[in-house]
């Protein structure tokens, strides 16, 4: 974990403790989960994205989850076992079905660390029946959050929350537009840090930070001279230095098409109802939960060509249930047919060394030069 990330976590601990003193309920959410934070915010709660990895948290997680479980899930459980000052303030854990890792991790956290769990289930298809199911599921989720919060969520409170989150999405979209038009002023690591602000400090702090960053871009220009790459696949939580290693090798990550990327927020919630929320989250194109949608690979190659990138780096956390070998094979075939330079990286927190990744990145750089 970098010095900046360490300081962010320290500051987040202080904020969460202050919120607890104000009788705010803290809801832990697996960082990659498709959980409508709007409902938690509307209920007066604070959604905290569980996004910490690194240290010996993954190995500690083996006490609860098999070593063949993805190391992000194991790291999350390991943080609880290590009595993380941030995570020990959590009042409820949102238990979703984003992936097998989330299912297992949230079950262990609730059972062994005695934290209330609130269930939410998402479909994996984009059909009319899936939308109907999700609308009903979000209504159940809303009722469960209301019961835990001790009061109902009014229509006005939900509308206010949706508009606030849409404001953040508009700011992110504006930033992406400036990045594209001006030649990518911010590095991939800097863009990643913007999302970490949201994960740790919440929607209001994220909005203020984005406004400051946008103002700071005025009059700035890109440094240039680096090979531009598209980053896709698994997200990069706090403590994962993969994008830092990529950029240290002379690349510039111009698009991060994961749940830790700005392009994840390319659309808005159109309306102020549960139905509007369901449509938004079901159609999240860059969500790993929807990785098997037919448009994913077509969309990836289209973005590559439109951005004039030099290559694609596809990142997979080892044992991730969302990226089986069939995905790797299909992706490799698609990119080979298009003659697109491509590197697939697989990593396990606590096991894969930086030196191993640096060697592969250097070879890829030589290929695209």
Name the predicted role of every residue range.
Residues 293-338:
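C-terminal hydrophobic structural anchor segments
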Residues 328-369:
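Peripheral docking tails and interdomain loops at the edges
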């Amino acid at each position: 974990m970098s010095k900046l990330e360490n300081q962010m976590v320290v500051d987040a601990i202080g904020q969460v403790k202050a919120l607890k003193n104000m009788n705010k309920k803290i809801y832990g959410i697996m960082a990659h989960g498709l959980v409508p934070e709007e409902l938690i915010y509307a209920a007066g709660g604070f959604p905290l994205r569980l996004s910490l990895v690194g240290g010996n948290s993954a190995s500690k997680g083996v006490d609860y989850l098999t070593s063949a479980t993805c190391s992000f899930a194991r790291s999350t459980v390991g943080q609880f076992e290590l009595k993380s000052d941030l995570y020990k303030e959590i009042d409820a854990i949102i238990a979703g079905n984003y992936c097998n890792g989330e299912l297992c991790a949230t079950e262990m956290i609730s059972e062994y660390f005695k934290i209330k769990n609130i269930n939410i289930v998402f479909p994996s298809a984009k059909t009319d029946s899936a939308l109907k199911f999700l609308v009903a599921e979000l209504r159940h989720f809303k009722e469960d959050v209301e019961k835990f919060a001790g009061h109902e969520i009014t229509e006005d409170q939900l509308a206010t929350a949706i508009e606030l989150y849409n404001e953040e999405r508009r700011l992110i979209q504006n930033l992406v537009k400036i990045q594209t038009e001006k030649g990518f002023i911010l590095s991939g690591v800097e863009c990643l840090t913007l999302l970490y602000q949201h994960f740790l400090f919440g929607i209001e702090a994220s909005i203020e930070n984005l406004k400051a960053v946008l103002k700071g871009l005025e009059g700035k220009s890109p440094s240039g001279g680096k090979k531009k790459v598209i980053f896709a696949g698994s997200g990069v939580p706090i403590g994962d230095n993969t994008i830092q290693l990529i950029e240290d090798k002379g690349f510039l990550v111009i698009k991060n098409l994961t749940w830790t990327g700005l392009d994840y927020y390319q659309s808005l919630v159109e309306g102020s109802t549960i139905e509007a929320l369901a449509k938004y989250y079901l159609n999240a194109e860059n969500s790993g939960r929807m990785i098997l949608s037919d448009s994913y690979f077509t969309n990836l190659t289209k973005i590559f060509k439109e951005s004039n990138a030099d290559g694609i780096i596809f990142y997979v956390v080892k044992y991730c249930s969302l990226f089986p070998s069939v995905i790797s094979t299909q992706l490799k075939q698609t990119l080979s047919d298009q003659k697109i330079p491509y590197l697939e990286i697989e990593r396990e927190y606590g096991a894969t060394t930086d030196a191993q990744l640096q060697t592969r990145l250097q070879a890829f750089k030589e290929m695209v030069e």
